[in-house]
């Protein structure tokens, strides 16, 4: 753990800087806890001799890691450490994004120079970017689908030929070894590239994108390298036979594509195409990432409307009508691109019948009709889905806690992934080998039928579920005719795949949980339908396919707790509006029942990572708290004209300041300093880099006036303060912040209630909210962590502890 008082060595320091140093150095209290209410008394502002650095009130300091000395630059991802992450902690390592434009003089001057034609051009560029997002997301989805189809097909053909060969000769243990080895080999490569190259590419990426859109800066989450590892990893995971799907990671992939395209450059490749420079800020990037997430859903399921609703329900924290149109446009372009390219690949250029990575097939409303009497049955299935989803999430919670504590090294993570791959193949082989459920072989009933000990013209039905990609297994459970599976086969498959999927989610591989959830639900849903037909004998229950559909919706809803978007996704993926109402009932019931026991899977993992995630509303019992009780103090304030040495020292000491600094000024020597504006750390970094000093301007040493473009060129990887050399003479210079600060920051009185502060902060996407008294003096600063630390628990309002990492 780094000491917060660690200083950066500079070329020189004068006596005034040494006098100011005690205010800049704060040592963390080992084991110091955070008080229940972070109250701040009316502390007087303190000023160091001959400097303009202010501290207001009191603060409990915390320890930070070395890599966080400059929060505005993404830290290099270290190997995971054994840290006490859980849902009762809030990590200090996460920083916020700036979703509120800083309306300083540079910004206003640029906006005033833009005429109506230029604004129309900017709007056209937004639509062009959305089209590019849709096209590239669709192409990435095509690449994943084609590679998975070919590699998985090759693997299953080799294993099938080997099993057919050794079934007659004996020695099926060699077939088991071959299957387990192939699976382990693919997963080994997929896990190594994630664990050692880009850990943020693990999982589906949906929790990370939710956090990004919420305003939390997740390092490396939208990097080009992350996209490459994500795509490669998900291919290897699916081909490796894990209980995963390739659809969930498409949401992350689409988001990365959107973040890259919208900036008109690649910082990873160090290529700047000099286009779309206007959009190089967090506010614009956020909107395009929302479109990318929707395009990913659209490409995965062929559901453009569902993609828009998913982005609204699970992703985008900020919304407007124009954004809705652009997101829908990107989603439509994405699914059309995928459809068109796959039609060419399959040799049917004008047959646009493959809108998504998974095609659930058409459900014939006439053959699969439902009546009003089945509504209670569907609701009961929703209850089952909610309970099973809660069990799934609870088991995965304890498994994740175990991994955080004991499997935190990359080598151990790779070993676990390979072990799961081998166990998955072994369990599948044993179940297929032990099953005597033989069914007549029908044309096209399955891609790789295994005969084993069945008679000629028959195949092992357990293999139809296990010996296939998960997407094809889902379609098989939906559409295979009645009698294709016996109850024992479905029961065993449900039980085994449930635990395999639970064990698999959270591995250090790129994979999603959508398809495994659908597959589990389709299996027990089909079993539910078969049991119902046995009990009643009525023809109305004859087709188990509709119960497989309802079970799939119930299981997925019980795990991820989405209602609106999942209803539309299922309707679009099945090309059937008839079942819209029962699907909605099932999903709502599953969510209500599941929420009684535990959070949804994505929200649970966000909490386990101790992310300061802000929900839509403040806790319902928080009206008794005020801004004065939740704000952070002391606040580091700067003057309009500030010494360079003071600014350098402030930026070097991240333990005692935030990433925004109120700018204050005295009316005269007898009056207290009043708030004049707010300036960000990133802006100060750029000013220091370009040496925008008053003395240099007076001597004519500044070649040109700083423009907004200079700040955009530095975005998003602002250089660390350690990389900027400031000489002893330059430390004595002065910096005028008037032109660069935001002169109208959002403020609240210290008596404002927590819900009101929360609503203002959350709705406007703020990073800092200044708390002032009735004389407009700064008394505190509200940040994301100050609001996220209050959460409604089972026993009322809870305050989370701050993690020392």
Swiss-Prot record:
The chain crosses the membrane at residues 127-159, 174-197, 223-241, 247-264, 322-341, 375-405, 410-432, 487-507, 512-535, 579-597. GO terms for molecular function: ATP binding; chloride channel activity; chloride transmembrane transporter activity; chloride:proton antiporter activity. Chloride binds at residues 204, 514, 602. A motif (Selectivity filter part_2) lies at residues 245-249. The keyword Transmembrane helix applies. Residues 1-49 are annotated as: Disordered. It holds the Pfam family Voltage_CLC. The record marks 314 as: Mediates proton transfer from the protein to the inner aqueous phase. Gene3D superfamilies: CBS-domain (3.10.580.10), Clc chloride channel (1.10.3080.10). It is a multi-pass membrane protein. Changing residue 715 to C: In HOD; increased voltage-gated chloride channel activity; increased lysosomal lumen acidification; increased cytoplasmic vacuole size. The record marks 247 as: Mediates proton transfer from the outer aqueous phase to the interior of the protein. One of its GO terms (biological process) is response to pH. A motif (Selectivity filter part_3) lies at residues 512-516. Changing residue 762 to Q: In OPTA2 and OPTB4; not detected in the fibroblasts from the patient. PROSITE patterns: CBS (PS51371). The modification Phosphoserine is found at residues 9, 60, 801. It catalyses: 2 chloride(in) + H(+)(out) = 2 chloride(out) + H(+)(in). One of its GO terms (cellular component) is chloride channel complex. Slowly voltage-gated channel mediating the exchange of chloride ions against protons. Functions as antiporter and contributes to the acidification of the lysosome lumen and may be involved in maintaining lysosomal pH. The CLC channel family contains both chloride channels and proton-coupled anion transporters that exchange chloride or another anion for protons. The presence of conserved gating glutamate residues is typical for family members that function as antiporters. Chloride channel 7 are heteromers of alpha (CLCN7) and beta (OSTM1) subunits. This is H(+)/Cl(-) exchange transporter 7. It comes from Homo sapiens. The lineage of its organism: Eukaryota, Metazoa, Chordata, Craniata, Vertebrata. The gene is CLCN7.
């Amino acid at each position: 753990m780094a000491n917060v008082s660690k200083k950066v060595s500079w070329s020189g320091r004068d006596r005034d800087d040494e006098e100011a140093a005690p205010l800049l150095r704060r040592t963390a209290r080992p084991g110091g806890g955070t008080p229940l209410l972070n109250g701040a008394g009316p502390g007087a502002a303190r000023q160091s001799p001959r400097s303009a650095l202010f501290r207001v009130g009191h603060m409990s300091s915390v320890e930070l890691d070395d890599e966080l000395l400059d929060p505005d630059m993404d830290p290099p991802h270290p190997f995971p450490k054994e840290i006490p992450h859980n849902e009762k902690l809030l990590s200090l390592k996460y920083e916020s994004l700036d979703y509120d434009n800083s309306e300083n003089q540079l910004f206003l001057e640029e906006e005033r120079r833009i005429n109506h034609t230029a604004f129309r051009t900017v709007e056209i560029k937004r639509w062009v970017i959305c089209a590019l997002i849709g096209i590239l997301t669709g192409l990435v989805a095509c690449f994943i689908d084609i590679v998975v189809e070919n590699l998985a097909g090759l693997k299953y053909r080799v294993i099938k030929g080997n099993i057919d060969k050794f079934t007659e000769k004996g020695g099926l243990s060699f077939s088991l070894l071959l299957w387990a080895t192939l699976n382990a080999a693919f997963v080994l490569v997929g896990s190594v590239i994630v664990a050692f190259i880009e850990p943020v590419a693990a999982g589906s990426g949906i929790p990370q994108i939710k956090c990004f859109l919420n305003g939390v800066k997740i390092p490396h989450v939208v990097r080009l390298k992350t996209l490459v590892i994500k795509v490669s990893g998900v291919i290897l995971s699916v081909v490796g036979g894990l209980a995963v799907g390739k659809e969930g990671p498409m949401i992350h992939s689409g988001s990365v594509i959107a973040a890259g395209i919208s900036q008109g450059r690649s910082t990873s490749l160090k290529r700047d195409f000099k286009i779309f420079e206007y959009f190089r800020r967090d506010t614009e990037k956020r909107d395009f990432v929302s479109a990318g997430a929707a395009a990913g859903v659209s490409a995965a399921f062929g559901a453009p409307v569902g993609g828009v609703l998913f982005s609204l329900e699970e992703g985008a924290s900020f919304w407007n009508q124009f954004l809705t149109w652009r997101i829908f446009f990107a989603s439509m372009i994405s699914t059309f691109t995928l459809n068109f390219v796959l039609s060419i690949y399959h040799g049917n250029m004008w047959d646009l019948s493959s809108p998504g990575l998974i095609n659930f097939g058409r459900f014939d409303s006439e053959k699969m009709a439902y009546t009003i009497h089945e509504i209670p049955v569907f609701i009961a299935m929703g209850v089952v889905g909610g309970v099973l989803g809660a069990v799934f999430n609870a088991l995965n919670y304890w498994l994740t806690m175990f991994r955080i504590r004991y499997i935190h090294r990359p080598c151990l993570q790779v070993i676990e992934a390979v072990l799961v791959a081998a166990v998955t193949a072994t369990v599948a082989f044993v179940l297929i080998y032990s099953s005597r459920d033989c069914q007549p072989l029908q044309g096209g009933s399955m891609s790789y039928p295994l005969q084993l000990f069945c008679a000629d013209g028959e195949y092992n039905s357990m293999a139809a579920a296990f010996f296939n990609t998960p997407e094809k297994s889902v379609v098989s459970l939906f559409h295979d005719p009645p009698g294709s599976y016996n109850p024992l086969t479905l029961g065993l498959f449900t039980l085994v795949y449930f635990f395999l999927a639970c064990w698999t989610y959270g591995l250090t591989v790129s994979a999603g949980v959508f398809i495994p959830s659908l597959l589990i639900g389709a299996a027990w849903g089909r079993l539910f339908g078969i049991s119902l037909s046995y009990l009643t004998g009525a023809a109305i229950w004859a087709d188990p396919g509709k119960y497989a559909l309802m079970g799939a919706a119930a299981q997925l809803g019980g795990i991820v707790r989405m209602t609106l978007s999942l209803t539309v996704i299922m309707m679009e993926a099945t090309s059937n509006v008839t079942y819209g109402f029962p699907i909605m009932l099932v999903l709502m019931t599953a969510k209500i029942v599941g929420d009684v026991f535990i959070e949804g899977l994505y929200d649970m993992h966000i909490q386990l990572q101790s992310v300061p995630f802000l929900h839509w509303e403040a806790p319902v019992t928080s009206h008794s708290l005020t801004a004065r009780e939740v704000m952070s103090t002391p606040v580091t304030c700067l003057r309009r004209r500030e010494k360079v040495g003071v600014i350098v020292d402030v930026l070097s000491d991240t333990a005692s300041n935030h990433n925004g600094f109120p700018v204050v000024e005295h009316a005269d020597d007898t009056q207290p300093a009043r708030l004049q504006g707010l300036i960000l750390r990133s802006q100060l970094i750029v000013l220091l880099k370009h040496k925008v000093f008053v003395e240099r301007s007076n001597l004519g040493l500044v070649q040109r006036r700083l423009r907004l473009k200079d700040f955009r060129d530095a975005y998003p990887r602002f250089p660390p303060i350690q990389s900027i050399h400031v000489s002893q003479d330059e430390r004595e210079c002065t910096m005028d912040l008037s032109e660069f600060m935001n002169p109208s920051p959002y403020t609240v009185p210290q008596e404002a209630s927590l819900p009101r502060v929360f609503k203002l902060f959350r709705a406007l996407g703020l990073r800092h909210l200044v708390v002032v008294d009735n004389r407009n003096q700064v008394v505190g600063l509200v940040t994301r962590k100050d609001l996220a630390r209050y959460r409604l628990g089972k026993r009322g309002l809870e305050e989370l502890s701050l993690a020392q990492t």
